[in-house]
């Protein structure tokens, strides 16, 4: 197959969404298919690009991407800039339809149409909404099947942030685009069911998964001293509340001051974490370490005694299956999750004894005490072990998606050939 894979997020941009799309490209290329990636130019770094003779990467200009800061700054300045940028982003997002990737979308569409290369299928991974619009138009232009990979839901998402009038517009346009697709993919059963009901199209679940190769040279080699907890990624005060966990740490130290613990946060500046550190007098044990590249993030996860996963405590989170969950599975360290306790992520952790899922600070304190005492006694914290982990690899999930694509488009290709 000649596959046109569309997403503005792609390495070297260090995002979980870019990891998912890059692994699709890599695995499909390994399977012998020609993959052309249509993405954006970006000054971002931190994630290794896939290199394979069957992959070609085509980048269209994106004015928004060029505005991203690339130079390091002092921590206080970086926090201020991050807060300002986030506010400006939210404001701009509300004024531009369908989203801030609109200019990139036009450039990407022109770039693809000016080329003589012709795909057998167009696969668009979204959001943003623009990626779906570009995919829809190019599939029509080339008269080939169209497939949508919903990493997140869009107009039907619980995260939808705009008003009623715009919501009606987005719903109408997305309905038209989604019903054009031969296949819809998404990351969990609950989201797949929503898509099926909304758009009445064939749907497949393609988990984010993890890549065992990312961890093959990484080992858990515990260092003497405190129990070390690591969090990698965004901390959003409105959706990923660190409060229950940090209050659990505070409670542990109040009840068992002799125990040693160290908590490190890596990622964009987490203002709410810094505020709570001060309020709870946790400066001695909780630190913000800044942003790191993807390879370093994986190493930090593998070296930690346990990992912290912050998700939204809301029923709308039921079907959200972050790629970070699977990286943590690959690291084989105990997971401490806060958020919606009936979500698919919570079920994966609870049903497979991969750690603890709770928003109760007392339970968190008790669990941390168990881990700290285990390390004190044995010199390490045992990994949970997960016999079924192979089902959750990127290879397996990418092949599953590829099989579904081939099955979905086969009748259309035969019809077109006839």
What residue spans do the PLM features occupy?
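Acidic anion/phosphate-binding donor-loop and adjacent secondary structure
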Residues: 48, 65-71, 210-226
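N-terminal subdomain of nucleotide-sugar transferases
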Residues: 1-65, 183, 203, 252, ...
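Nucleotide-sugar-dependent
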Residues: 236, 240-243, 293-300, 307-329, ...
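Carbohydrate-associated surface elements
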Residues: 190, 209
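Conserved donor-binding/catalytic core segment of Leloir-type glycosyltransferases
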Residues: 4, 221-239, 246-247, 397
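A conserved catalytic-core segment of Leloir-type glycosyltransferases
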Residues: 39-107
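Nucleotide-activated donor-binding/catalytic signature segment of Leloir-type glycosyltransferases, i.e.
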Residues: 256, 260, 267, 272-298
């Amino acid at each position: 197959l000649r596959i046109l894979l569309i997403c503005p997020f792609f390495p070297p941009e260090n995002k979980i969404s870019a990891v998912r799309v890059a692994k699709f490209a890599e695995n499909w290329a390994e399977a012998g298919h020609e993959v052309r990636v249509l993405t954006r130019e970006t000054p971002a770094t931190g994630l290794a690009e896939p290199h394979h003779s069957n992959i070609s990467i085509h980048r269209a200009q994106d004015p928004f991407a060029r505005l991203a800061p690339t130079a390091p700054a002092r921590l206080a300045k970086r926090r201020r800039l991050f807060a300002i940028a986030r506010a400006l982003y939210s404001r701009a997002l509300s004024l531009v339809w369908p989203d801030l990737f609109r200019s990139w979308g036009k450039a990407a569409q022109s770039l693809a149409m000016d080329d003589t290369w012709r795909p057998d299928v167009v696969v668009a991974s979204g959001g943003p909404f623009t990626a779906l619009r570009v995919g829809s138009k190019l599939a029509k232009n080339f008269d080939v099947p169209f497939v949508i990979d919903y990493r997140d839901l869009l107009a039907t998402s619980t995260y939808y942030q705009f008003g009623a009038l715009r919501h009606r517009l987005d719903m109408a346009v997305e309905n038209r685009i989604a019903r054009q697709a031969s296949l819809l993919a998404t990351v969990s059963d609950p989201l797949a069911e929503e898509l099926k009901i909304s758009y009445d199209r064939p749907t497949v679940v393609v988990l984010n998964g993890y890549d065992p190769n990312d961890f093959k040279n990484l080992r858990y080699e515990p260092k003497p001293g405190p129990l070390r907890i690591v969090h990698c990624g965004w901390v959003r005060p409105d959706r990923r509340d660190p409060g229950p966990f940090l209050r659990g740490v505070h409670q542990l130290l109040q009840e068992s001051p002799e125990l040693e613990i160290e908590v490190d946060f890596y990622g964009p500046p987490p203002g709410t974490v810094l505020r709570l550190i001060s309020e709870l007098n946790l400066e001695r044990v909780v630190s913000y370490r800044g942003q790191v590249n993807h390879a370093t993030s994986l190493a930090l996860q593998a070296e930690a005694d346990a990992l912290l996963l912050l998700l939204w405590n809301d029923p709308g989170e039921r079907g959200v299956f972050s790629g970070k969950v699977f990286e943590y599975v690959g690291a084989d360290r105990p997971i401490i999750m806060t958020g919606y306790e009936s979500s698919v992520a919570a079920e994966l952790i609870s049903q497979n004894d991969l750690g603890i899922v709770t928003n109760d600070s007392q339970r968190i304190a008790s669990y941390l005490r168990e881990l700290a005492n285990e390390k004190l006694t044995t010199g390490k914290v045992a990994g949970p072990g997960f016999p079924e982990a192979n089902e959750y690899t990127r290879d397996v999930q990418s092949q599953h998606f590829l099989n579904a694509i081939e099955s979905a488009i086969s009748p259309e290709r035969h019809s077109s050939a006839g």
